[in-house]
Protein backbone atom coordinates (compact mmCIF):
# COMPACT_ATOMS: atom_id res chain seq x y z
CA UNK A 1 0.00 0.00 0.00
CA UNK A 2 1.44 3.38 -1.02
CA UNK A 3 1.66 6.08 1.61
CA UNK A 4 -0.38 9.20 0.93
CA UNK A 5 1.35 12.48 1.62
CA UNK A 6 -0.33 15.59 2.93
CA UNK A 7 -0.71 18.22 0.26
CA UNK A 8 0.44 21.82 0.00
CA UNK A 9 4.06 20.81 0.54
CA UNK A 10 4.92 21.66 -3.05
CA UNK A 11 3.97 24.59 -5.25
CA UNK A 12 0.51 23.98 -6.77
CA UNK A 13 0.34 23.26 -10.46
CA UNK A 14 -2.54 23.33 -12.90
CA UNK A 15 -3.26 21.33 -16.00
CA UNK A 16 -4.72 22.95 -19.14
CA UNK A 17 -8.46 22.50 -19.55
CA UNK A 18 -9.19 20.10 -22.41
CA UNK A 19 -12.52 21.80 -23.11
CA UNK A 20 -12.59 20.87 -26.80
CA UNK A 21 -12.64 17.18 -25.89
CA UNK A 22 -16.17 15.65 -25.93
CA UNK A 23 -15.35 13.82 -22.67
CA UNK A 24 -15.17 17.21 -20.96
CA UNK A 25 -18.96 17.49 -21.36
CA UNK A 26 -19.87 13.82 -20.83
CA UNK A 27 -22.55 13.74 -18.13
CA UNK A 28 -21.65 10.39 -16.56
CA UNK A 29 -17.95 11.25 -16.35
CA UNK A 30 -18.72 14.69 -14.95
CA UNK A 31 -20.97 13.30 -12.20
CA UNK A 32 -18.35 10.68 -11.32
CA UNK A 33 -15.68 13.37 -10.91
CA UNK A 34 -18.02 15.61 -8.91
CA UNK A 35 -18.77 12.73 -6.54
CA UNK A 36 -15.07 11.90 -6.16
CA UNK A 37 -14.06 15.49 -5.38
CA UNK A 38 -17.07 16.16 -3.16
CA UNK A 39 -16.14 13.06 -1.17
CA UNK A 40 -12.67 14.39 -0.42
CA UNK A 41 -14.05 17.84 0.41
CA UNK A 42 -16.58 16.30 2.81
CA UNK A 43 -13.81 14.41 4.60
CA UNK A 44 -11.62 17.50 4.97
CA UNK A 45 -13.83 20.62 5.37
CA UNK A 46 -10.95 23.09 5.65
CA UNK A 47 -12.79 25.24 3.10
CA UNK A 48 -15.95 25.71 5.22
CA UNK A 49 -15.32 29.41 5.85
CA UNK A 50 -15.02 30.30 2.17
CA UNK A 51 -17.85 30.70 -0.36
CA UNK A 52 -21.30 29.15 0.02
CA UNK A 53 -20.43 26.18 -2.20
CA UNK A 54 -18.90 24.37 0.74
CA UNK A 55 -21.57 24.91 3.43
CA UNK A 56 -24.12 23.95 0.77
CA UNK A 57 -22.25 20.72 0.03
CA UNK A 58 -21.72 19.82 3.67
CA UNK A 59 -25.37 20.50 4.55
CA UNK A 60 -26.46 18.22 1.71
CA UNK A 61 -24.19 15.46 3.00
CA UNK A 62 -25.14 15.92 6.66
CA UNK A 63 -28.85 15.81 5.82
CA UNK A 64 -28.57 12.72 3.60
CA UNK A 65 -29.56 9.23 4.71
CA UNK A 66 -26.02 7.83 4.48
CA UNK A 67 -24.21 10.92 5.80
CA UNK A 68 -21.88 10.49 2.83
CA UNK A 69 -21.77 11.97 -0.66
CA UNK A 70 -23.39 8.86 -2.13
CA UNK A 71 -26.54 9.82 -0.23
CA UNK A 72 -26.83 13.17 -2.05
CA UNK A 73 -29.05 13.27 -5.14
CA UNK A 74 -27.11 14.06 -8.31
CA UNK A 75 -29.52 16.88 -9.16
CA UNK A 76 -28.51 18.59 -5.92
CA UNK A 77 -24.89 18.79 -7.05
CA UNK A 78 -25.93 21.85 -9.06
CA UNK A 79 -26.75 23.69 -5.85
CA UNK A 80 -23.05 23.50 -5.06
CA UNK A 81 -21.99 24.50 -8.58
CA UNK A 82 -24.28 27.54 -8.56
CA UNK A 83 -22.60 28.95 -5.44
CA UNK A 84 -19.11 28.96 -6.99
CA UNK A 85 -18.02 32.15 -8.73
CA UNK A 86 -14.52 30.93 -9.59
CA UNK A 87 -12.64 33.14 -7.13
CA UNK A 88 -9.92 30.46 -6.63
CA UNK A 89 -9.59 31.06 -2.88
CA UNK A 90 -10.07 27.38 -2.06
CA UNK A 91 -7.40 26.39 -4.56
CA UNK A 92 -4.91 29.06 -3.53
CA UNK A 93 -5.32 29.19 0.24
CA UNK A 94 -7.10 26.18 1.75
CA UNK A 95 -7.12 22.93 -0.20
CA UNK A 96 -4.25 20.58 0.76
CA UNK A 97 -4.94 18.23 -2.15
CA UNK A 98 -4.34 20.41 -5.19
CA UNK A 99 -1.99 19.11 -7.91
CA UNK A 100 0.66 17.71 -7.75
CA UNK A 101 -1.01 15.77 -4.90
CA UNK A 102 -2.22 12.40 -6.14
CA UNK A 103 -5.87 13.28 -5.43
CA UNK A 104 -5.52 16.04 -8.02
CA UNK A 105 -8.30 18.29 -6.72
CA UNK A 106 -8.91 21.58 -8.49
CA UNK A 107 -12.34 22.57 -7.24
CA UNK A 108 -12.77 25.83 -9.22
CA UNK A 109 -11.83 24.19 -12.52
CA UNK A 110 -14.24 21.34 -11.84
CA UNK A 111 -16.99 23.87 -11.17
CA UNK A 112 -16.12 25.56 -14.47
CA UNK A 113 -16.37 22.21 -16.24
CA UNK A 114 -19.81 21.65 -14.71
CA UNK A 115 -20.97 25.13 -15.72
CA UNK A 116 -19.69 24.55 -19.26
CA UNK A 117 -21.46 21.19 -19.55
CA UNK A 118 -24.73 22.70 -18.36
CA UNK A 119 -24.42 25.67 -20.71
CA UNK A 120 -23.70 23.42 -23.66
CA UNK A 121 -26.85 21.41 -22.98
CA UNK A 122 -29.28 23.99 -21.61
CA UNK A 123 -27.89 27.47 -22.31
CA UNK A 124 -28.44 30.16 -19.67
CA UNK A 125 -31.36 31.98 -18.07
CA UNK A 126 -32.48 35.34 -19.44
CA UNK A 127 -31.21 37.12 -16.34
CA UNK A 128 -27.76 35.59 -16.62
CA UNK A 129 -27.46 36.26 -20.35
CA UNK A 130 -28.49 39.87 -19.77
CA UNK A 131 -26.00 40.45 -16.96
CA UNK A 132 -23.22 38.79 -18.97
CA UNK A 133 -23.85 40.94 -22.07
CA UNK A 134 -21.77 43.79 -20.70
CA UNK A 135 -20.72 45.24 -24.06
CA UNK A 136 -24.27 45.40 -25.41
CA UNK A 137 -25.87 46.65 -22.20
CA UNK A 138 -23.11 49.20 -21.63
CA UNK A 139 -23.29 50.56 -25.17
CA UNK A 140 -27.07 51.00 -25.11
CA UNK A 141 -27.30 52.23 -21.52
CA UNK A 142 -24.44 54.67 -22.12
CA UNK A 143 -26.12 56.55 -24.97
CA UNK A 144 -26.50 60.22 -23.94
CA UNK A 145 -30.03 60.73 -22.69
CA UNK A 146 -30.62 56.99 -22.40
CA UNK A 147 -28.13 56.77 -19.54
CA UNK A 148 -30.18 59.27 -17.52
CA UNK A 149 -33.32 57.17 -18.01
CA UNK A 150 -31.53 53.90 -17.22
CA UNK A 151 -30.01 55.30 -14.03
CA UNK A 152 -33.38 56.69 -12.92
CA UNK A 153 -35.09 53.38 -13.69
CA UNK A 154 -32.52 51.45 -11.64
CA UNK A 155 -33.57 53.52 -8.60
CA UNK A 156 -37.31 53.21 -9.22
CA UNK A 157 -39.02 50.72 -6.91
CA UNK A 158 -41.95 49.88 -9.24
CA UNK A 159 -39.70 49.48 -12.29
CA UNK A 160 -37.24 47.31 -10.36
CA UNK A 161 -40.08 45.04 -9.25
CA UNK A 162 -41.18 44.74 -12.87
CA UNK A 163 -37.60 43.93 -13.91
CA UNK A 164 -37.46 41.27 -11.21
CA UNK A 165 -40.56 39.57 -12.63
CA UNK A 166 -39.39 39.80 -16.25
CA UNK A 167 -35.65 39.15 -15.98
CA UNK A 168 -35.18 37.71 -12.49
CA UNK A 169 -32.91 40.54 -11.27
CA UNK A 170 -33.77 41.07 -7.60
CA UNK A 171 -35.48 44.39 -6.94
CA UNK A 172 -33.18 45.01 -4.00
CA UNK A 173 -29.94 44.28 -5.87
CA UNK A 174 -27.75 47.32 -6.30
CA UNK A 175 -27.19 48.09 -9.98
CA UNK A 176 -24.32 50.28 -11.21
CA UNK A 177 -24.96 53.63 -12.87
CA UNK A 178 -24.00 54.13 -16.51
CA UNK A 179 -21.93 57.02 -17.83
CA UNK A 180 -22.52 58.62 -21.23
CA UNK A 181 -18.84 59.60 -21.51
CA UNK A 182 -16.89 56.37 -21.04
CA UNK A 183 -13.32 56.05 -19.87
CA UNK A 184 -11.92 55.10 -23.26
CA UNK A 185 -13.30 58.31 -24.75
CA UNK A 186 -11.88 60.34 -21.86
CA UNK A 187 -8.43 58.86 -22.43
CA UNK A 188 -8.51 59.13 -26.24
CA UNK A 189 -5.85 61.21 -27.96
CA UNK A 190 -2.25 62.02 -27.04
CA UNK A 191 -1.28 61.68 -23.40
CA UNK A 192 1.02 63.98 -21.43
CA UNK A 193 4.08 61.70 -21.37
CA UNK A 194 6.06 60.55 -24.38
CA UNK A 195 6.51 56.74 -24.37
CA UNK A 196 10.16 57.37 -25.19
CA UNK A 197 10.73 58.61 -21.62
CA UNK A 198 9.70 55.25 -20.12
CA UNK A 199 12.28 53.74 -17.77
CA UNK A 200 12.29 49.94 -17.68
CA UNK A 201 12.84 48.02 -14.48
CA UNK A 202 13.49 44.34 -13.87
CA UNK A 203 9.83 43.23 -13.94
CA UNK A 204 8.21 46.27 -15.51
CA UNK A 205 8.97 48.16 -18.68
CA UNK A 206 7.77 51.51 -17.44
CA UNK A 207 4.90 52.23 -19.84
CA UNK A 208 1.34 50.97 -19.54
CA UNK A 209 -1.44 50.00 -21.92
CA UNK A 210 -4.63 50.26 -19.86
CA UNK A 211 -7.33 47.66 -20.55
CA UNK A 212 -10.27 49.75 -19.37
CA UNK A 213 -12.68 46.86 -18.56
CA UNK A 214 -16.45 47.09 -18.94
CA UNK A 215 -17.03 48.33 -15.41
CA UNK A 216 -14.45 51.12 -15.36
CA UNK A 217 -15.24 52.13 -18.93
CA UNK A 218 -19.02 52.44 -18.63
CA UNK A 219 -19.78 52.59 -14.91
CA UNK A 220 -16.85 54.08 -12.96
CA UNK A 221 -14.57 55.95 -15.40
CA UNK A 222 -13.24 57.99 -12.50
CA UNK A 223 -11.35 54.91 -11.32
CA UNK A 224 -9.44 54.83 -14.57
CA UNK A 225 -8.73 58.54 -14.55
CA UNK A 226 -7.38 58.28 -11.00
CA UNK A 227 -5.13 55.35 -11.93
CA UNK A 228 -3.80 57.18 -14.98
CA UNK A 229 -3.06 60.22 -12.81
CA UNK A 230 -1.08 58.04 -10.39
CA UNK A 231 0.85 56.37 -13.20
CA UNK A 232 1.69 59.62 -14.96
CA UNK A 233 2.69 61.23 -11.65
CA UNK A 234 5.27 58.48 -11.42
CA UNK A 235 6.59 59.05 -14.93
CA UNK A 236 4.77 56.09 -16.51
CA UNK A 237 3.32 56.85 -19.98
CA UNK A 238 -0.19 55.46 -20.56
CA UNK A 239 -2.10 54.43 -23.67
CA UNK A 240 -5.29 52.48 -24.35
CA UNK A 241 -5.75 49.72 -26.95
CA UNK A 242 -7.34 50.89 -30.20
CA UNK A 243 -10.25 48.52 -29.64
CA UNK A 244 -11.51 46.61 -26.65
CA UNK A 245 -14.35 44.26 -25.91
CA UNK A 246 -15.41 42.51 -22.73
CA UNK A 247 -12.64 40.18 -21.60
CA UNK A 248 -15.13 37.31 -21.39
CA UNK A 249 -15.14 36.71 -17.63
CA UNK A 250 -18.95 37.06 -17.28
CA UNK A 251 -19.34 34.47 -20.04
CA UNK A 252 -16.76 32.21 -18.41
CA UNK A 253 -18.80 32.23 -15.20
CA UNK A 254 -21.80 31.05 -17.23
CA UNK A 255 -19.73 28.26 -18.78
CA UNK A 256 -20.03 29.82 -22.24
CA UNK A 257 -16.52 28.94 -23.35
CA UNK A 258 -17.16 29.56 -27.05
CA UNK A 259 -17.97 33.20 -26.27
CA UNK A 260 -14.77 33.42 -24.23
CA UNK A 261 -12.89 32.13 -27.28
CA UNK A 262 -14.47 34.80 -29.49
CA UNK A 263 -13.53 37.54 -27.03
CA UNK A 264 -10.00 36.18 -26.93
CA UNK A 265 -9.74 36.35 -30.72
CA UNK A 266 -10.60 40.05 -30.63
CA UNK A 267 -8.57 41.16 -27.61
CA UNK A 268 -5.40 39.09 -27.62
CA UNK A 269 -3.91 40.03 -31.04
CA UNK A 270 -3.92 43.76 -30.35
CA UNK A 271 -2.71 43.29 -26.76
CA UNK A 272 0.10 41.07 -28.05
CA UNK A 273 1.14 43.82 -30.49
CA UNK A 274 1.30 46.28 -27.60
CA UNK A 275 3.49 43.86 -25.65
CA UNK A 276 5.76 43.53 -28.69
CA UNK A 277 6.03 47.33 -28.73
CA UNK A 278 7.25 47.34 -25.14
CA UNK A 279 4.06 48.06 -23.18
CA UNK A 280 3.00 46.47 -19.91
CA UNK A 281 -0.75 45.85 -19.59
CA UNK A 282 -2.95 46.74 -16.62
CA UNK A 283 -6.66 46.19 -16.01
CA UNK A 284 -8.74 47.91 -13.36
CA UNK A 285 -10.94 44.94 -12.39
CA UNK A 286 -9.32 41.94 -10.63
CA UNK A 287 -11.51 39.36 -12.38
CA UNK A 288 -10.31 40.67 -15.76
CA UNK A 289 -6.70 40.35 -14.61
CA UNK A 290 -7.45 36.79 -13.45
CA UNK A 291 -8.90 35.89 -16.84
CA UNK A 292 -5.93 37.15 -18.84
CA UNK A 293 -3.23 35.91 -16.47
CA UNK A 294 -4.65 32.52 -15.55
CA UNK A 295 -7.83 31.35 -17.25
CA UNK A 296 -6.95 32.08 -20.87
CA UNK A 297 -3.57 30.28 -20.61
CA UNK A 298 -5.41 27.24 -19.21
CA UNK A 299 -8.10 27.32 -21.90
CA UNK A 300 -5.71 28.01 -24.80
CA UNK A 301 -2.50 26.37 -23.65
CA UNK A 302 -0.93 26.24 -27.12
CA UNK A 303 -1.52 29.90 -27.99
CA UNK A 304 1.79 31.77 -27.80
CA UNK A 305 0.11 35.18 -27.99
CA UNK A 306 -2.01 34.31 -24.94
CA UNK A 307 1.14 33.36 -23.02
CA UNK A 308 2.85 36.58 -24.09
CA UNK A 309 -0.05 38.74 -22.93
CA UNK A 310 -0.39 36.83 -19.65
CA UNK A 311 3.28 37.42 -18.84
CA UNK A 312 2.90 41.18 -19.38
CA UNK A 313 -0.42 41.57 -17.52
CA UNK A 314 -0.51 43.17 -14.06
CA UNK A 315 -2.95 44.12 -11.36
CA UNK A 316 -2.46 47.88 -10.74
CA UNK A 317 -1.26 47.39 -7.16
CA UNK A 318 1.05 44.57 -8.22
CA UNK A 319 2.51 46.88 -10.84
CA UNK A 320 2.98 49.84 -8.53
CA UNK A 321 4.59 47.61 -5.90
CA UNK A 322 7.01 46.27 -8.52
CA UNK A 323 7.94 49.83 -9.50
CA UNK A 324 8.33 50.76 -5.83
CA UNK A 325 10.68 47.84 -5.18
CA UNK A 326 12.74 48.94 -8.17
CA UNK A 327 12.83 52.52 -6.77
CA UNK A 328 10.93 54.06 -9.68
CA UNK A 329 8.01 55.58 -7.76
CA UNK A 330 7.98 59.23 -6.78
CA UNK A 331 7.67 59.50 -3.01
CA UNK A 332 4.84 61.76 -1.82
CA UNK A 333 6.23 64.46 0.53
CA UNK A 334 3.79 63.89 3.40
CA UNK A 335 4.47 65.74 6.62
CA UNK A 336 3.28 63.49 9.38
CA UNK A 337 1.28 65.14 12.10
CA UNK A 338 -1.88 64.69 14.10
CA UNK A 339 -4.88 64.43 11.74
CA UNK A 340 -2.72 65.35 8.74
CA UNK A 341 -2.95 62.00 6.95
CA UNK A 342 -5.95 59.68 6.95
CA UNK A 343 -6.38 56.19 5.53
Regions found by a protein language model. Give the residues of each.
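Short cysteine clusters
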Residues: 41-47, 51, 84-91, 95, ...
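A short, structure-level motif marking secondary-structure boundaries and short turns
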Residues: 22-23, 32-33, 66, 211-213, ...
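Generic N-terminal leader/targeting and pre-domain segments
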Residues: 1-25, 29-44
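Non-heme iron-sulfur electron-transfer modules
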Residues: 6-24, 49-85, 97-127
